[in-house]
């Protein structure tokens, strides 16, 4: 049996004011073409299909087109669950009718102990839910963390587990120790959001969404597919794609399959003049770029100048102000006032004080000392 595991499409995502629908349409077209080659028995989408609970019409249309090609044209069964970014009611609309074409949409807990059986494999679904939603569903005020809530869910599923079959869990959550990125919205505020791996022991394999790094956690049976695209500059350099999971004679194996996007996220560090004069290495000028540059304090509108050469510049950081706080605190504590000012001026401008500037500052310091006396 072959299963394709994907998640975190985040359709409609806007990064630093840039709408990413073109990039998402490109990668979904590539994904569909790959599925023609893969010919999987089923595709699992583990949450966050949309980036917001109220996606745009274009984002909705893009999802409908992709699912239509996969499910109706290629006739591949699909299981999808809601993530913390998805609007449950919107994603679940028409779900009972879609099941006639083996498109299974799960957005709540009403069927957590009723697996979807495909080719003898039982797929249990555990869509994203807040702590308060789990507390309300189980009518249990003692549930105060995701760990407690998910544990209660697994306890509900456990009596239904067929130990003679392969049992797979699909969920959208954070496993303790998983690598996070800036584009993942926190699941909770003020409570512990991660879940310990041991809670999943009753399952043969676990397919997760939420964390965007495909290797967020090192485990033989608990896997994240990662997002289809890089969605924050903290993800720059990360491979993106999907997981191919195979089951042969009861043995489960998986491999990550990378996809090449239309554009990547790239971070460029260096001198402002070198970048403007194109003396730095950039993989692709059309990539989405975050520049971290020195010596640009004198430039009136550096972002506009950069965009004339690098049209998809999305972020600019003035590196002049970055420093090692601990080391500088120790160094400054051993300096006199004049030396500190000289160091600060050099740090900001990369120049030394002129004799005229030094004399003026010395006079000011001497006058202040006289006032204190």
Curated annotation (Swiss-Prot):
InterPro entries: Calcineurin-like_PHP_ApaH, DNA_Repair-Maintenance_Comp, Metallo-depent_PP-like, Mre11_N, SbcCD_nuclease, SbcD, SbcD_C. GO terms for molecular function: 3'-5' exonuclease activity; endonuclease activity. The keyword Nuclease applies. One of its GO terms (biological process) is DNA recombination. It comes from the Bacteria. The keyword Glycoprotein does not apply. Pfam families: Metallophos (PF00149), SbcD_C (PF12320). Keywords: DNA recombination, DNA replication, Endonuclease, Exonuclease, Hydrolase, Nuclease. SbcCD cleaves DNA hairpin structures. These structures can inhibit DNA replication and are intermediates in certain DNA recombination reactions. The complex acts as a 3'->5' double strand exonuclease that can open hairpins. It also has a 5' single-strand endonuclease activity. PANTHER family: COMPONENT OF ATP-DEPENDENT DSDNA EXONUCLEASE, NUCLEASE SBCCD SUBUNIT D. Belongs to the SbcD family. Heterodimer of SbcC and SbcD. This is Nuclease SbcCD subunit D. It comes from Staphylococcus aureus (strain MRSA252).
């Amino acid at each position: 049996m072959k299963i394709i595991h994907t998640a975190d499409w985040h359709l409609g995502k806007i990064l630093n004011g840039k709408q990413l629908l073109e990039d998402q349409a490109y990668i979904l077209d590539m994904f569909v073409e790959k599925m023609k080659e893969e010919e999987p028995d089923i595709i699992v989408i583990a949450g966050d299909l949309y980036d917001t609970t109220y996606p745009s019409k274009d984002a909705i249309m893009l999802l409908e087109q992709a699912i239509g090609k996969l499910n109706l044209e290629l006739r591949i069964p699909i299981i999808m669950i809601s993530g913390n970014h998805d609007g449950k009611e919107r994603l679940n609309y028409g779900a009972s009718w879609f099941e006639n074409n083996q498109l299974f949409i799960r957005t709540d807990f009403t069927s957590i102990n009723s697996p979807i059986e495909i080719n003898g494999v039982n797929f249990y679904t555990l869509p994203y839910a807040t702590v308060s939603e789990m507390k309300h569903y189980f009518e249990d005020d003692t549930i105060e963390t995701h760990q407690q809530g998910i544990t209660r869910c697994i306890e509900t599923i456990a009596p239904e587990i067929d130990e003679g079959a392969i049992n797979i869990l699909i969920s959208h959550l954070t496993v303790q120790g998983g690598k996070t990125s800036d584009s993942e919205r926190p699941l909770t505020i003020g409570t512990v959001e991660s879940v310990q791996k041991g809670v999943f022991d009753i399952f043969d394999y676990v397919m997760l969404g939420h964390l965007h790094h495909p290797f967020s956690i090192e485990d033989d049976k608990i896997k994240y597919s990662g997002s289809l695209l890089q969605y924050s500059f903290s993800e720059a350099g990360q491979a993106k794609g999907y997981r191919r999971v195979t089951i042969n004679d009861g043995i489960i194996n998986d491999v990550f399959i990378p996809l090449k996007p239309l554009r990547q996220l790239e971070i460029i560090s260096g001198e402002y003049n070198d970048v403007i004069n194109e003396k730095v290495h950039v993989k692709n000028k059309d990539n989405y770029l975050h520049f971290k540059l020195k010596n640009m304090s004198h430039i009136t509108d550096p972002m506009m100048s950069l965009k004339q050469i690098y049209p998809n510049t999305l972020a600019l950081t003035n590196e002049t102000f970055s420093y090692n706080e601990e080391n500088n605190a120790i160094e400054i504590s051993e300096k006199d006032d004049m030396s500190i000012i000289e160091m600060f001026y050099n740090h900001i401008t990369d120049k030394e004080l002129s004799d005229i500037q030094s004399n003026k500052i010395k006079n000011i310091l001497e006058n202040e000392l006289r006032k204190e006396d």
